[in-house]
Amino acid sequence: MAYNWQTEPNRAEPQEGGHDHQQCHHADQHLSSRQVRLGFDQLVEELSNKTPLPEDEKEGTCFVPDTPNLDSKWQSIYGPHPRHFNEFTSQSPHFSQLPFGKASAIGFNPAVLPAHQFIHEGASWRNPTRKYHGGEDPRFSALTPSSTGLDKCHQQGQSGTEHCNYYVEPENNVPHHYSPYSMDSIPDSEEKGSGDADLVEPSLVFSKDSFLPRASENMSVESTEPIGCPLEIVEAPQGSNKSLASFCNNVTKIRGLYHASDTNSNSGKIWAITTAYPSRLFADTQFRVKISTDNSAQLLLLKPPANYLVKDLIAEILLLCANEQLSPKEYLLSICGSEEFLQTDHCLGSHKIFQKSKSVIQLHLQRSRDTPGKLSRKRDDDRSRVHLNQLLEFTHIWKISRQCLSTVMKSYNLHVEHLLKTQEDVEEKPLSSMFSCGRHPPQPHGNDIIEDVRNICSVLGCIETKQVSDAVKELTLILQRPSQNFHQNSETSKKGFIENVTSELSRSLHQLVDVYCSSFCTDFRPARAPGGVSRDHAGLHSHLSFTVCSLHNVPETWAHSYKAFSFSCWLTYAGKKLCQVKSCRSLPVTKSFSFSVNWNEIINFPLEIKSLPRESMLVIKLFGIDSATHSANLLAWTCLPLFPKEKSPLGSRLLSMTLQSEPPIEMMAPGVWDGSQPTPLTLQIDFPAATWEYVKPETEENRTDHQEPPRECLKHIARLSQKQPPLLLSVEKRRYLWFYRFYCNNENSSLPLVLGSAPGWDEGTVSEMHAVLRRWTFSHPLEALGLLTSRFPDQDIREVAVQQLDNFLTDELLDCLPQLVQAVKFEWSLESPLVELLLHRSLQSIRVAHRLFWLLRDAQGEDYFKSWYQELLAALQFCAGEALIEELSKEQKLVKLLGDIGEKVKSAGDAQRKDVLKKEIGSLEEFFKDIKTCHLPLNPALCVKGIDRDACSYFTSNALPLKITFINANPMGKNISVIFKAGDDLRQDMLVLQIIQVMDNVWLQEGLDMQMIIYGCLATGKAQGFIEMVPDAVTLAKIHLHSGLIGPLKENTIKKWFSQHNHLKEDYEKALRNFFYSCAGWCVVTFILGVCDRHNDNIMLTKSGHMFHIDFGKFLGHAQTFGGIKRDRAPFIFTSEMEYFITEGGKNTQHFQDFVELCCRAYNIVRKHSQLLLSLLEMMLHAGLPELRGIEDLKYVHDNLRPQDTDLEATSHFTTKIKQSLECFPVKLNNLIHTLAQMPAFSLARPAPQTPPQECCVLNKTRTIQRVTILGFSKTHSNLYLIEVTRSDNRKNLAKKSFEQFYRLHSQIQKQFPLLTLPEFPHWWHLPFTDSHHERIRDLSHYVEQVLHGSYEVANSDCVLSFFLSEHIQQTLEDSPFVDPGDHSPDKSPQVQLLMTYEDTKLTILVKHLKNIHLPDGSAPSAHVEIYLLPHPSEVRRKKTKCVPKCTDPTYNEIVVYDDVSGLQGHVLMLIVKSKTVFVGAVNIQLCSVPLNEEKWYPLGNSII
């Protein structure tokens, strides 16, 4: 985790080392009624529970704060108990009266961190010897350090703090002489000396001014703190960290653009999602809409066209209701069952609900004024301000630290004052009077002062600079010397020395506090600025150098385990190292107040400052030399940007270090680790007292070096751009593309590809990249999405990308919102255009704000960037307003309750789980009694008011997810069931479903509705989240179970199930059509994404025919293995039982050809958007998903998309995958294993009653069967029998029944009449396989006769009558339920379908399908196609396809290529169809008359001409 010293609280157990009797202050009590809750409620609650406020028995005792919420790593190092100097006392009567009876034990575990910057020996207090020679450079302008330069650079370098949201307003309580953010500069001064070595070991003499002060304008050396000036700090509502205060100010400005009175941006309503109108899909579509109104109970049934505007529909409704005088602008249409409203300025077909729902849509008409937006911002929200101290109060950390620091400072000031006063009294007395008493002069308050210094350092993270240490030692020596050893004049007396030393000690402490406030985010700062000095600035041609001074607060366990410590550092940019790693010497720890390591080593990189990229990062790693093995072990690391806000760091910096095992080089950005949040381990670095401001060079575009490329080069550029993503381009291809960059445009290339091919990030290359950027015209905003990946850290490039995304509609932004949240990681500051875009859109849309809230909540569980996400989340909550924040707070409480219930259900035994769940449901009922209503995190438009207790349950899978059914708060809506799952990472499911949704959107825009069901999924935290339940959906495993033990091996299982649940012909045809399209869609998406772990338990079907997949824990080809063999052996799931249903039991084999055509068409449409899909996946590479981590995962998707193929090649490829899936027997075997595993759960021994094997028609019991005769059997399907049924009225009808259907009838009779003696059914052992089918007919006829002439009750039962009398549904299917992409010829003549292309002497022939082909005896052939090009210069003229066995309508989709064809004129294509060696048909085609690039059916003759 990014914050290793914080752990998740265990509220059931007291903290180790804590005090159970102590009380905690709740975070809420710090909020006034007008303050806005800004997030971190969970963090507040954790700290409130984990951080007791101890009340010491001894009055006047104060506890210096310990480190808050140390996690296991820090606790194992520092231990859970505070050390002895965390507690300090005073016997002073003045000190005992100070108000610190209670203080929180929050802060830092004691240990001392060593001295600050050391420079050459002989350097005076204000005169360091090092010198930097300045120079001119167009990229940088040297800035002399101002009196506040250190503060400015330190603050700008911070990426943020964990606790952010503050008032940004003028501070009236700050003394006027303190100017924390002044930009005034001070004069330069000439200094001598320079360092050329990479590693320079300076003298151990410490420079007294290494802490660069924050004085006001032109403050010189003499402008120092006067003697006797006390240590004081003041509250800083804006925060001591300037970058965070600036971010708060920026957030306030953004929120100020959207006033509560603006109903356009602040309607408070949730609008239905809209997309671009898919005109191809809804060319002549009319929707069926039912309208309800408040004034009438009668529903209006309308059929408006898809392009009908919502406001026009409202006007028509008002006209029909005789309310023509009312204005349509005063009304809105809401979707029944939700709090979602149609957007009045959009057409109906643009709304997602109309695009996906094919049933009647129910809408409700209501006045706008009667539906006030309950989630809108109020005027009080406009008056609230974002205030740093609000967040800091929530944590209790800095507020109490400020109190403690102020307390110990007051103690220090009192003791210093008493010491000087006492010494003055002593020296005023005659020496003789002192010696007459036989004693030395007293040494009052000396030890108290040293103890106060120790406590001040402890509050400040146990940071003890060498200045402080030296001053303490000097004070101790002076106090130990007798007064007679000093001269008696005012300057050389003991009192004079004490005044000088205490003044120096105060100044050192003051500088320590100042640098601490500059480096870390606190809500206090020194009341006065330290004195300033004049400095030279280093030349831009100088090499980058800085001094690594000290490591503070080294754990005692490390001091004993490691004999020495060292560090290494390097520079990174865009995930790559800019130079070789620099290492330092190893040194042991030293002990003063605590343990520290003092290196004071100068690091000099062989890189000129002007050559460094603007977004360079410095990374430092700490190593410990093991005492036993002498090996170097990585202990901690930290990082910081070299040019935060385009200026270099200045002076001394304190950096917190993290115990993460390795720094993520590929993710190195300012937010990866927030050094402004103190940790127990702190590193001190000194930068030169100069700064540089980055100036973007203005360069002219130069194309004189490049001649106009030939046509072949432009074609090659287009091929490269269409075939490869940037990450997978070879070095040669990138070099080629970059060389011709000025000839790339949006027609032949993509901007991420061109810029990603740049050879580096030096000044010249970046300038050329900016030149390409300026002249580029984007074809679509989504093209810019690839510029926000980690490969493009340049701020100008990212800004252009955000400008393009700003052209998106707000609803369109939702499709890529998870990727944008991840892209925040690689921004250079929280004031970036991307962050501003997210906040702007959140203020414009409640749906965006709601989704962004939960994405940020979930992102805080990642290992890195946690602080940035917390600050962005706080800014979002500030912008959202109190009403929305209150709703989000309810949702968080609901999530917590469900998480607790899930844990209790898991911990209970199998027998007690149901009882535990029923008992815990009561807590949800109490929750709704208190809050009345709550929106669901899964969808903010769904508002619920209670729990349907009887409908709640849990699933028996490993994670034991809960099924929770909520009562809809909308009276016109049904109950809402969701799955709450804890224990599985749902972020991967979210990503897969998001990519599938993008594919579906692409299909819809192309006019192709694949009938996809894409359910909702939302991760709400670490390994927990919600999943939408699709009504009336069952797993394929349950369907297999109802078909007996070997149900997965049967081919008619799916067909039979749909027949049972769709009694009407119209319903059956609709289900068949929905299955046809949805099965094709899921075949495509699961193949492209490589979804694994596919079996009948994660494939679901609805009665309306929709098929969809669930559970995406394995994808990108990461299949599970058993004994080294992959369990997923098929490219995707398409089994013979699915084909059996599509082809209606093999009767319509041309439907399989239609299915293949649909799959290939959908596949080729998605392939056109390969770059978009790869960009979306690439942006999630650093999200910490278990199966998406590297380039090889992207390459897997790229290889499945095959963007380098033509559409013909891709069609042939995917057809091969369909055939491989269809022939993969291990899929059926895997389904069988899962079915057997489910047998105990479904009680297969006594299955539940189910419907008859045929559709259940309502029959009249007076109708009886006179006779049933089995006439024969099918030649193609040997288990299908033709029967003739004679009714009592002598009417006859024919039906086809399978052997399995007869068996199902027998089973149904047994269940319905368990007490009757029934005839024995002829099982398979009565029907030997070697016997003829006539014997089977005889046995079945005997069985039917016994059934009909036996018991009257059985013969006239519903199941028997429905079996024989109801017409077989397939007899009524005369019209094809499919929408064929091409035209079908009504005749039955044999034909072949071809598609031909001709380009650059290359003739390509795609052999697609044959139909209506038979052998001379009428049987199905095993046909292949032979093709001859006549005449052909080559000897090899014949080319042939593979053989398709036993099929009258075979599918091939195979490519035949002839090269070196100079022209089509005079060439004839001879095509022959054979079944092995038997001739089937042939055709000769004159190529000059062939329509190229078009599919065409050619008739086959019976001879070769």
Swiss-Prot record:
Record field: compositional bias (Basic and acidic residues): 10-31
Domain PIK helical: 703-879
E.C. no: 2.7.1.137, 2.7.1.154
Gene Ontology terms, MF aspect: 1-phosphatidylinositol-3-kinase activity; 1-phosphatidylinositol-4-phosphate 3-kinase activity; ATP binding; phosphatidylinositol binding
Region (Disordered): 1-32
Residues of the PX domain: 1259-1371
Annotated Gene Ontology cellular component terms: cytoplasm; membrane; nuclear envelope; plasma membrane
Domain C2, chain residue ranges per copy: 1384-1505
Domain PI3K-RBD as annotated: residue spans: 278-370
Catalytic loop: annotated segments: 1090-1098
Membrane topology annotation: Peripheral membrane protein
Species per Swiss-Prot/TrEMBL record: Rattus norvegicus (Rat)
Annotated PI3K/PI4K catalytic domain residues: 948-1226
GO biological process: cell migration; chemotaxis; phosphatidylinositol 3-kinase/protein kinase B signal transduction; phosphatidylinositol-3-phosphate biosynthetic process; phosphatidylinositol-mediated signaling
Tissue specificity statement from the Swiss-Prot or TrEMBL entry: Predominantly expressed in normal liver. High levels also found in regenerating liver. Very low levels found in heart and testis.
Record-linked InterPro entries: ARM-type_fold, C2_dom, C2_domain_sf, Kinase-like_dom_sf, PI3/4_kinase_cat_dom, PI3/4_kinase_cat_sf, PI3/4_kinase_CS, PI3K-type_C2_dom
Region (Activation loop): 1109-1135
Pfam families noted in UniProt: C2, PI3_PI4_kinase, PI3K_C2, PI3K_rbd, PI3Ka, PX
All copies of domain C2 PI3K-type, residue ranges: 540-688
Function: Generates phosphatidylinositol 3-phosphate (PtdIns3P) and phosphatidylinositol 3,4-bisphosphate (PtdIns(3,4)P2) that act as second messengers. May play a role in SDF1A-stimulated chemotaxis.
Reaction(s) catalysed (UniProt annotation): a 1,2-diacyl-sn-glycero-3-phospho-(1D-myo-inositol) + ATP = a 1,2-diacyl-sn-glycero-3-phospho-(1D-myo-inositol-3-phosphate) + ADP + H(+); a 1,2-diacyl-sn-glycero-3-phospho-(1D-myo-inositol 4-phosphate) + ATP = a 1,2-diacyl-sn-glycero-3-phospho-(1D-myo-inositol-3,4-bisphosphate) + ADP + H(+)
Family: Belongs to the PI3/PI4-kinase family.
Keywords: ATP-binding, Chemotaxis, Kinase, Lipid metabolism, Membrane, Nucleotide-binding, Transferase
Region (G-loop): 954-960
Main location, first listed in the record: membrane
Protein's name in the database: Phosphatidylinositol 3-kinase C2 domain-containing subunit gamma
Protein's cellular compartments: Membrane
